[in-house]
């Protein structure tokens, strides 16, 4: 008997791609075939094949910040992308499609509807992106990570890597910690220059109280090392951290952006956080961060308000007991079965 097949529509950023990979891997273990639809010039083109998943491409890009010519051409570009996606869907014959966001899922979702293939949507953020808002009207089933994106969609959490849930619980991790507070600073793929420039000034005032790991992003190690100056021995600086689960588990508190995936990873491990949301016009990251700050598992500092002095005052007053309580609250907000639940819904609605 032929295996069932899922076509994944996701691309652009890790926040869309990594949760989709987690769902794909769950279904692969259940003898499903997976095919991916993306764009050639975004991260999925390099990343997805590393997981042994075949990928096909359509031509589409975002319109935000583009000139008038691009806007005038947009209807033709979208129509062309729908036709390209329709051809691929007719060739691949999937039993269901999973839309996880990114430009690619718009035209691909319309093509799936035209081909009569069930559409399962998953919204990773606390506020729905434009593509998912539109696709939500034609989708067979809509799922969401946070309870605020769609009024009646099932809340399943964000599918995150299994190794995050395998870390020891916060009370076990904290049981033998007596030395300096451990601070993990994650600039993320957007670099978060604001964190790279602020933290060296914080450490200059609190060097005797903090031990830092700082992920600075691509090409920033030398510049940030110079900013730390004489306090460099208190800090472990890296471009990227390969084992994020271990890094989160090492930390007493994480200072980072609040992309949807990051918020759910922090909940999965159970660690306190100071979120500095990226200043997006629809407040996406701020609303993601509220998922944990509303239960006192995290603090939000708006980028406009972030100063070294403010961070020094906040960190100075933190105790390990405070941070353990925050970590335990974060852990209660995690949803360890997200990938499994999305996979179940796909199986339920598939042709």
UniProtKB/Swiss-Prot annotation:
GO terms for molecular function: UDP-N-acetyl-D-glucosamine:N-acetylmuramoyl-L-alanyl-D-glutamyl-meso-2,6-diaminopimelyl-D-alanyl-D-alanine-diphosphoundecaprenol 4-beta-N-acetylglucosaminlytransferase activity; undecaprenyldiphospho-muramoylpentapeptide beta-N-acetylglucosaminyltransferase activity. Coiled coil: none annotated. Pathway: Cell wall biogenesis; peptidoglycan biosynthesis. GO terms for biological process: carbohydrate metabolic process; cell division; cell wall organization; lipid glycosylation; peptidoglycan biosynthetic process; regulation of cell shape. Its main location: membrane. Its EC number is 2.4.1.227. InterPro entries: GlcNAc_MurG, Glyco_trans_28_C, GlycoTrans_28_N. This is UDP-N-acetylglucosamine--N-acetylmuramyl-(pentapeptide) pyrophosphoryl-undecaprenol N-acetylglucosamine transferase. It comes from Haemophilus influenzae (strain 86-028NP). The gene is murG.
